[in-house]
Amino acid sequence: MSGEKTDCQKFFEANAENNQRCKALQDFPSEVQIAWESQSASEVSPGVVTDNEQLCRHWTNPIHYDDATGTLKLTAFDDAAGIGLSVNRMAHTTLAAVGQFASARVLGWNAEHGYMPQRSLVGYSLFDAKEARQVLTNDAPARRAFGVYDTAKVPNETTGQEGDTSHADVCQLIAGPQAARSLRHRMRDLLAPRLTPFSNGDSPEASSA
């Protein structure tokens, strides 16, 4: 990506340290939210996220997964209304790379927080970008509930953030706690049945379990 920054990129760069960036996005009109999906949000972007792109979301226990029910927690989707629900674009990465990255994060967190309940990698869910974009509100007139943005990550030596051109965010576009809960249910209904364990070749943690 080169040239003048888009409004979308300006917004996401200005809110890079804002853990409520999706809430900030909710302040914009629907037409702006949707238009920004057609603009690059990062200087290292490989291009905007198209409807037919396959996306991958990984899940950890106990943050996202409920052992008692054997399924994803509703709160696993809270990030969509806050910092953004991080996903990887499978056109720009591999399942093995996602599994190894996710496993490294889990192992790193456990090493730094040995005094807390330890986390484990549960698996992943695959879905097309258009499936998130096709979720509509129940009220009339129905409107788009989620946007998918190509928030490719730039390496940052100061924070230790690794570069990741496959990174994208699913953001909830509708404000309000009641709407948020209903929409989280819709996303869980979409992704929970697709929860798949990483194979040994996709995750170092799986191979050592």
Specify the residue positions occupied by each region the protein language model found:
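Fungal intrinsically disordered, Ser/Thr/Pro-rich regulatory tracts
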Residues: 57-63
